[in-house]
Every structure is written in structure tokens, then in C-alpha cells.
């Protein structure tokens, strides 16, 4: 079973790497508009809006991959525990193992991802 979990971790890390690469590319292209204010957001060109869309999409996909694939796989690999547990319990345990710096930070970024995914500025 360890080999299967290791493969799942490797696959998730590879996917995360692709999302991070696209996020970094988008950030470079968006650098001139940061810090992003309401006025700057309203003045974005169609091309800049497309890049911002790509950034938001990749941020959401990265969060999904980490939360749905990587974190559970790392937990199973480290704890050899396949019992289904509440996600917050897994986060807290990984924080205690120093895999995560903060379970609260993870929840904050997950909440941010959910807000971005469900509240998009009208244009």
C-alpha cells in the first residue's frame, strides 16, 4: 500500500507544480496592476482580465489538488491510517507533525478560494 500512496503523492505534487507554474506566469503578467484596487480592477483590459481569470482558476485548482489529493495522501503515508477522519483533524495532525505550518492558515486560504470561486466581479 505504501507504493500506491507514494504514487498518489507524486502525482498530486506533479499536478500542483503545473498549477504553480501557471500561477507564477499569470502573476508576472499581472505585476503592473498590483496592488489590485477596485479602480485598477475596473480598468483591466480584456487580456488582463483573461490572465486574472487564469490566475483565479489555477489558484482554485491548486487548492483543490492540495486539499483533495495531496494532504490526505501525505496523512495516510505518514500515519499509516486509512480510517476516514474529518479534514480538520487531518490538518491538525499534519500541523503537529510540522508538515503544515498552520491548520488555520490552510482554512483561511480555502475560504479565500471559495469566496473567489463564488463571487466574481461583474464586468
Language-model regions: role of each:
Residues 1-123:
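Solvent-exposed interaction patches of small proteins and small membrane subunits
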Amino acid at each position: 500500500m505504501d507504493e500506491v500512496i507514494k504514487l498518489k503523492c507524486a502525482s498530486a505534487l506533479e499536478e500542483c507544480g503545473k498549477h504553480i507554474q501557471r500561477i507564477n506566469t499569470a502573476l508576472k503578467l499581472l505585476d503592473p496592476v498590483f496592488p489590485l484596487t477596485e479602480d485598477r480592477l475596473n480598468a483591466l483590459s480584456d487580456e488582463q482580465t483573461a490572465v486574472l481569470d487564469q490566475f483565479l482558476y489555477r489558484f482554485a485548482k491548486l487548492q483543490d489538488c492540495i486539499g483533495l489529493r495531496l494532504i490526505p495522501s501525505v496523512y495516510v503515508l505518514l500515519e499509516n491510517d486509512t480510517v476516514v477522519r474529518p479534514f480538520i483533524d487531518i490538518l491538525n495532525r499534519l500541523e503537529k507533525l510540522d508538515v503544515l505550518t498552520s491548520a488555520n492558515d490552510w482554512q483561511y486560504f480555502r475560504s479565500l478560494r471559495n469566496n473567489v470561486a463564488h463571487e466574481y466581479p461583474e464586468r
